[in-house]
Amino acid sequence: MENWQAWRKQQRERLIADRMAVSALQHQHWSNTISDFLQREFLVLQTMKIGLYWPFRGEYDPRSASLYFWESGATLALPEVVDRHKPLVFREWWPDVPMKTGAYNIPVPQGTHRIEPDVLIIPVVGFDQKGYRLGYGSGYYDRTLAAYPVPPLTIGVAFEMQRLENVHPQQHDIAMQYVVTEAGMFKGCF
C-alpha cells in the first residue's frame, strides 16, 4: 500500500469501533483478566512510580489494577495534555483525588504534583508483533517517551482483537517493551 497514513487512519477507526462494540460484560471480563496479569507478572510495580491513564473510548480499564498497586505502595499518576505539540505531563493520582476535565474530556488530577514515572502503562488502539502501537494519531506517547533521558518501562495494554500483523511504524514510533492482553503477557518482539 502506498499511503500508510491513510491505512493507519482506517485501521484506527475500525479498531476503535470494534472495541466500543464489545459488550459491557465482555469488556469487564477482559479488563479483569488483564489486571490480573499485571498484578501477577509485574510485582515490581508495587514500589514504583506508575503512569497510567483514565479509560477512554472502550480502552482496557486500569482502575482496579491502579487501586491494587496504590494499596501496595506504588505512586500513581495520570497524563495531562498541556500542549498539543509537547510531551504529556503526569500528575499524581490516588482514589478520591479532586479531578478536572482535561483535553478530550478525559479527567485529570487537579492541583497534584508532577511525577516522572518509572513505568508507563499505555493504552493501545492497535499493536503488532514487534511491540509497536497504533495510537490515536497525535503522537503524545511517542513524544513523551522520546523526552525522557532514561526511558521508563513501557507496558502496552490492549484486547487481542486489537492485534495487527504490522502497524507500519513511522520513524518516530517507539516500540513497547511489553504488551498485556487478556491472552497473556508478551515481551519485546513477539
Give the positions of each predicted feature.
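N-terminal active-site beta-alpha-beta segment that forms phosphate/nucleotide-binding
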Residues: M1-E116
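Conserved phosphate- and dinucleotide-binding cores of soluble alpha/beta proteins
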Residues: R84-F190
